[in-house]
Amino acid sequence: MAAVELEWIPETLYNTAISAVVDNYIRSRRDIRSLPENIQFDVYYKLYQQGRLCQLGSEFCELEVFAKVLRALDKRHLLHHCFQALMDHGVKVASVLAYSFSRRCSYIAESDAAVKEKAIQVGFVLGGFLSDAGWYSDAEKVFLSCLQLCTLHDEMLHWFRAVECCVRLLHVRNGNCKYHLGEETFKLAQTYMDKLSKHGQQANRAALYGELCALLFAKSHYDEAYKWCVEAMKEITAGLPVKVVVDVLRQASKACVVKREFKKAEQLIKHAVYLARDHFGSKHPKYSDTLLDYGFYLLNVDNICQSVAIYQAALDIRQSVFGGKNIHVATAHEDLAYSSYVHQYSSGKFDNALFHAERAIGIITHILPEDHLLLASSKRVKALILEEIAIDCHNKETEQRLLQEAHDLHLSSLQLAKKAFGEFNVQTAKHYGNLGRLYQSMRKFKEAEEMHIKAIQIKEQLLGQEDYEVALSVGHLASLYNYDMNQYENAEKLYLRSIAIGKKLFGEGYSGLEYDYRGLIKLYNSIGNYEKVFEYHNVLSNWNRLRDRQYSVTDALEDVSSSPQSTEEVVQSFLMAQNVEGPSC
């Protein structure tokens, strides 16, 4: 019989041997631990494939075993699969390992420096894995233990280690929304850097400044975030780890987006995507990180269709790496939910957006406390979707139920945002604006007006008179005055202001202009100004023609398959533009 007609393919000798060891796991358990790390991991992966999670969990919960498995660097994706399966199964392997490491650090406090140095190295690898896997609280516990060991020796090597600890701590605290601890972590890192400087030593500051930028961005301190991104870019040098370079480019791009420096943002994020795929591969979590930020850029420059495609690609990667109930998967679901909501806003088809929003909330509520800040944005997205579904619903009872659910979600999001950021913050203002829109749908017009005005005042003071966020809130207040309160003169002024900001930032084909143009057509019809009605019908027709031509060909992923510039050229181009323009804030 020809080989191609075989209905099965024989196992390799190696795989047969691994299967034999697993079949005799109980008897050979101790011997397995003496195998080289790659072979030892393959035995454990076979346990995972056979669904023997209790046995796998008992192995991975032992710090010595897991530390050895972590040395099999080329198996990291497969390790994420095993680890997530254990977490989903209810084996709290992340917290067990973090506790074991912390306890070991307390035991060796009196040991010599070499023992502590070895423990710190183990901690960096363990904490790094937990951080990459999204188990931020456990990673934080590990890094705090490492930092404690560093403080026991007042010498140069441990100052370098302490700086690295602080950078990693800042990263996991940012990821876990512990922003109140972020600035003190940064200051501690600076203290150690100053010590090093006094002794003629320098630690590269790119990663630290990049994490500070992420912290300030999350708190909506956009001017400060931009300033520190510039400082981080200055620190990019030859020999810096690619991961650090990619992360700094990502953060700088996001800071440029919110400052509406779109050309700079495009150059930075496209190079970050290219660099991540070229270095890590197209199935790596770091590549998915860059895709999420690329999607953020595309959404903000109004290339909504491509942004949805990029967010979907990022989610696919994260699901293939992590699967299960993982925070990285949840954030990708949320980003895709919001972009799908924006994309389908005109059509009213929100099934896909709602699915992803509910998946995000389901995952977050399963693995994090019910008052965790990450829930604020997911609940906000679901509330926006429910409101639109309610508006299109013909059953009054169902409409009221959906609006009430959206109201509860918005209020919960607002309370979480105020607790984390205070009243005077862009995130809080967004929630006020969302409540304003909802109250309009609920026909509570005075409450709606109050919320919109509050949102506009906060955004104007924080972002200036001509920001995109201000235009959104101004347009929403115009809609309220036009459709429900008959305040046509006020509505007209607000519509024209919103249109002017939109055109200035995004050009004549900006998608948000449609709602302002339609609002003005309705307004001029209401007051009998038919000349203006005709004028804006023509404007809307021209806008539609522009939209048909816009983004009709470009494939966003194809667009980043190569980079015309080296990393050094990208960095220098950014810094030279900065020098020409002068400081932003």
Curated annotation (Swiss-Prot):
Gene3D superfamilies in the record = Tetratricopeptide repeat domain
Supply the Pfam families for this chain: TPR_10, TPR_12
Q: How is its activity regulated?
A: E3 ubiquitin-protein ligase activity of the CRL2(APPBP2) complex is inhibited by APP.
What are the alphabetically sorted keywords of the record?
Cytoplasm, Cytoskeleton, Membrane, Microtubule, Nucleus, Protein transport, Repeat, TPR repeat, Transport, Ubl conjugation pathway
Membrane topology per the entry is: Peripheral membrane protein
Q: Which SMART domains match?
A: TPR
- Output the InterPro entries linked to this UniProt entry: APPBP2, TPR-like_helical_dom_sf, TPR_rpt
Protein localization: Nucleus; Cytoplasm, Cytoskeleton; Membrane
PROSITE patterns in the cross-refs: TPR, TPR_REGION
Q: In which pathway does it act?
A: Protein modification; protein ubiquitination
Q: What do the Gene Ontology cellular component annotations say?
A: Cul2-RING ubiquitin ligase complex; cytoplasmic vesicle membrane; microtubule; nucleoplasm
Q: Which domain of life is it from?
A: Eukaryota
Give any GO molecular function from the UniProt entry.
ubiquitin-like ligase-substrate adaptor activity
Q: What does this protein do?
A: Substrate-recognition component of a Cul2-RING (CRL2) E3 ubiquitin-protein ligase complex of the DesCEND (destruction via C-end degrons) pathway, which recognizes a C-degron located at the extreme C terminus of target proteins, leading to their ubiquitination and degradation. The C-degron recognized by the DesCEND pathway is usually a motif of less than ten residues and can be present in full-length proteins, truncated proteins or proteolytically cleaved forms.
Assembly:
Component of a CRL2 E3 ubiquitin-protein ligase complex, also named ECS (Elongin BC-CUL2/5-SOCS-box protein) complex, composed of CUL2, Elongin BC (ELOB and ELOC), RBX1 and substrate-specific adapter APPBP2. Interacts with APP; APP interaction inhibits the E3 ubiquitin-protein ligase activity of the CRL2(APPBP2) complex.
The record's listing under PANTHER family reads: AMYLOID PROTEIN-BINDING PROTEIN 2
Protein name according to UniProt: Amyloid protein-binding protein 2
* Organism per entry: Mus musculus (Mouse)
